């Protein structure tokens, strides 16, 4: 599991309860824990540009329809709640996600 990869997640609490894709946010160097920090996705078209980063489906990310990363729903789950690897975000999409997280957490200056 590497930062920027998309995995399926299910069986965790709250927003990761039903099966859905999730982006790995945790730094690759922090891998000795039994948990991992993720950002779950939704296909709900709710307009919230700062908190819902749209990700268009493509071959690299493995998504089959437009999804939105819910940066206001960052959570940590047990690694055994992750299913299979779906794909990986490209650099530009990761930069958009990182920027949205910085703003949401008040770290954007």
Language-model segments: residues:
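Conserved functional hotspots at enzyme active or ligand-binding sites that engage polyanionic ligands
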Residues: 1-109
């Amino acid at each position: 599991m590497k930062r920027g990869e998309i995995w399926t997640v299910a069986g965790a609490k709250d927003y990761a309860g039903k099966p859905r894709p999730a982006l790995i946010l945790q730094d690759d160097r922090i891998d000795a824990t039994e948990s991992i920090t993720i950002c779950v996705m939704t296909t709900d078209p709710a307009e919230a540009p700062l908190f819902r980063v749209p990700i268009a489906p493509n071959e690299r990310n493995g998504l089959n329809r437009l999804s939105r990363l819910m940066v206001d729903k960052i959570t940590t789950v047990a690694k055994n709640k992750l299913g299979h690897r779906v794909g990986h975000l490209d650099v530009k999409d990761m930069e958009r996600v990182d920027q949205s997280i910085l703003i949401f957490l008040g770290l954007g200056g």
